């Protein structure tokens, strides 16, 4: 299984990535071994993850989410939270 995830960073920015192990990848990001962006924008929390069956699908979804505006990402996350709480 593969996952797309969104991290909240210390400066309130969002980082989107994909992996086959979210907790391990988050640890990499926190320890400066993740993506270039998270070396200068320290991640503090995983705020979203989505499971996909293949690496190819995860990469496509990552690119789709990365193309969204910050506003669209936040609105989508709000909808997901509302669905989980209902």
Where do the language-model regions lie?
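GIY-YIG nuclease catalytic motif and its immediate N-terminal context
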Residues: 1-34, 39-52, 56-76, 80-86
